[in-house]
Amino acid sequence: MSTPGIDPAIADFIAKVVHIGSAYDLDGMERLYTADQTFLILTSEGEVIRLTRAQVFDEFRARRDAGEPPLATEYRVLHVEEQGQDAVALLYRRMSPAAPPVLYELRLRKGPGGWAVAGETVTPWPGAEGGSFLPPRTRAA
């Protein structure tokens, strides 16, 4: 997905994050996320849920191991703000037709190996119904 005015390296990195994560490819995800990565979810009730990298990976592992279908790869880069070795990307993201769209904020950090996700924030898409950003599980873990 090419977005005018965005560093092609960041655009390519975001595409990898979406496609590798959507496939529950934990080995691939290991290379894309910093060791101290955090995940914040703003609920439709205004509460913030903070998850560690390990908690997010555990959820994706459980979904993969239970045979859940891959997540949808629907996304659109809305804006990227780059400041030296840091960048913030705002994305429209929809994980499944069974889950509402969300606004994704990716906090990126550039290191010797290139870009990595240092944090993510997920908020309800304006005007969308609240709910989990992941689709409901169809299989037990």
Residue ranges and their predicted role:
Residues G28, S44, T73, Y92-R93, ...:
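Generic detector of low-complexity/intrinsically disordered segments
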Residues L26, T38, D65-P69, G113, ...:
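Generic structural signal for secondary-structure transition and capping sites
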Residues M1-D36, Q55, A128-A141:
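Short, low-complexity N-terminal intrinsically disordered segments enriched in polar/charged residues
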Residues S2, I6-D12, T38-E45, L51-P100:
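Surface-exposed, charged secondary-structure patches
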Residues Y33-T34, R93-M95, T121-P124:
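Short beta-strand segments enriched in hydrophobic/aromatic residues
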Residues D36, E82-D86, K110-A116:
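Short, solvent-exposed coil/turn segments at beta-strand boundaries
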Residues P101-P135:
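Short beta-strand edge/turn micro-motifs at domain boundaries
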